[in-house]
A protein has these predicted regions:
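Short hydrophobic/aromatic beta-strand element in the GNAT-like acyltransferase core
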Residues: 27-32, 42, 58, 92, ...
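Conserved catalytic-core motifs of GNAT/GCN5-like acyltransferases
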Residues: 92-94, 104, 109-126
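Conserved beta-strand in the GNAT
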Residues: 31, 38-47, 53-60
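Conserved GNAT acetyl-CoA-binding A-motif
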Residues: 75, 81-96
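Active-site rim helix/loop that mediates acceptor-substrate recognition in acyltransferases
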Residues: 8-35, 44
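Conserved acetyl-CoA-binding loop-helix of GNAT-fold acetyltransferases
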Residues: 61, 67-80
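A short, well-structured alpha-helix characteristic of acyl/acetyltransferase catalytic modules
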Residues: 1-5
């Protein structure tokens, strides 16, 4: 699934970061399957007790399944879980210029833009959804 979104949404260099993330034990990570039992979307979150925030992490949809509502459902589910578990915590995420508008639909606001952060042509958009 990661590869279907590279290089438009992720840089090739991020694959190892994603793999390392998946072996962590202190995260919540969800996977959506379609009717053929194929993984079509995934994403997680993790609580940062130092600053009382929750990071929305590594959300992605297999590129062959974009525009089918999987990303929306996964994001709604994660935000709902976070607001139930951590009702007084802001939700943070970072994404690119290719997906920040998607997250704006859920109430996330841009706090910072860093040009070419992930790779040449892949800018980082830091976003927050405040409680």
């Amino acid at each position: 699934m990661f590869r279907t979104n590279t290089p438009h949404f992720f840089d090739y260099s991020e694959q190892q970061l994603f793999t390392n993330y998946l072996i962590k034990k202190d995260i919540q990570y969800y996977v959506l399957f379609n009717e053929d039992n194929r993984i079509v979307a995934s994403g997680g979150y993790g609580y940062n007790n130092k600053i009382n925030t929750v990071d929305l992490t590594w959300g992605m949809v297999d590129r062959n399944y974009h525009k089918n509502g999987f990303g929306r459902r996964l994001t709604e589910y994660r935000v709902q879980k976070i607001t139930t578990e951590y009702p007084k915590s802001d939700i943070l995420l970072n994404t690119t210029q290719n997906t920040f508008k998607f997250y704006e639909k859920f109430g996330f606001k841009i706090t910072k833009i860093t040009k070419d952060y992930y790779a040449l042509g892949l800018d980082r958009y830091d976003m927050i959804k405040s409680v």
